[in-house]
Amino acid sequence: MIKLVLLRHGESQWNRENRFTGWHDIDLTDQGRIEASNAGKLLRAEGFTFDIAYTSVLKRAIRTLWHVLDEMDLMWLPVTKSWRLNERHYGALQGLNKAETAQKYGEEQVLVWRRSYDTPPPALEKSDARYPGSQARYASLSEAEVPLTECLKDTVARFLPLWHETIAPEIRKGRNVIIAAHGNSIRALVKYLDNVSEDDIVGINIPTGIPLVYELDDDLKPIRSYYLGDQDALKKAQEAVAKQGKA
């Protein structure tokens, strides 16, 4: 049986401040580092091991993976970093407080921006300091590949080439894979693997620092999926994510 592990990064500073983060490269809090280390300890205790790891080019995911691999004594593991695993780009909302944005635009509108499948937030201007196109880490991307905003549909389209061309072939070779990424890039893969409808994806919330395990058949179709660890703590963490966009 094939097991794939997905892990959203530990709590970041902007998670704590309840801000839209997107492609902004904010670091983990002390709590986020603890969450990441605990995830590594839990994976080791449950008998997991890995042959290759994937993460984004944002430090909160990279550092989370470091902590996990350190706890598992797998720091030597090959790691592929890809912009395709970045968080969804939140456009002009990046940096804004979610509750304050809900007060201004209404909770319903913010829910649409945060969780709907095909409605992006207002776009950035290319002249905006938050536009990622001028950053060295994205120098190899075409102008069309650098987003000004994204909906989840855009994130799925961005991520799937990496899945089909790189990650899935490694899994088919029998390699054990961990992906340390972000709430919406993981939601993108969950939607694809589980064939979640556009309506139902609104209700899927990925908590920070809790490993999500997929058991897959030989065609990489899910047999089942489950989170490791305390299930009461998981439920509270998912509820906390869902409440972030309330006024």
From Swiss-Prot:
Keywords for this protein: Gluconeogenesis, Glycolysis, Isomerase
Keyword Acetylation: no
Domain of life: Bacteria
Recorded family membership: Belongs to the phosphoglycerate mutase family. BPG-dependent PGAM subfamily.
InterPro entries (alphabetical): His_Pase_superF_clade-1 (IPR013078), His_PPase_superfam (IPR029033), PG/BPGM_mutase_AS (IPR001345), Phosphogly_mut1 (IPR005952)
Residues annotated for substrate binding in this entry: 8-15, 21-22, 60, 87-90, 98, 114-115, 183-184
Tagged with keyword Isomerase: yes
Catalytic machinery residues: 9 (tele-phosphohistidine intermediate), 87 (proton donor/acceptor)
Enzyme Commission code(s) on record: 5.4.2.11
Molecular function via GO: phosphoglycerate mutase activity
Class of this enzyme: isomerase
Name of protein: 2,3-bisphosphoglycerate-dependent phosphoglycerate mutase
SUPFAM superfamilies recorded: Phosphoglycerate mutase-like
GO biological process: gluconeogenesis; glycolytic process
Pathway stated in the Swiss-Prot or TrEMBL entry: Carbohydrate degradation; glycolysis; pyruvate from D-glyceraldehyde 3-phosphate: step 3/5
Residues carrying the site annotation Transition state stabilizer: 182
Reactions catalysed: (2R)-2-phosphoglycerate = (2R)-3-phosphoglycerate
Protein's job: Catalyzes the interconversion of 2-phosphoglycerate and 3-phosphoglycerate.
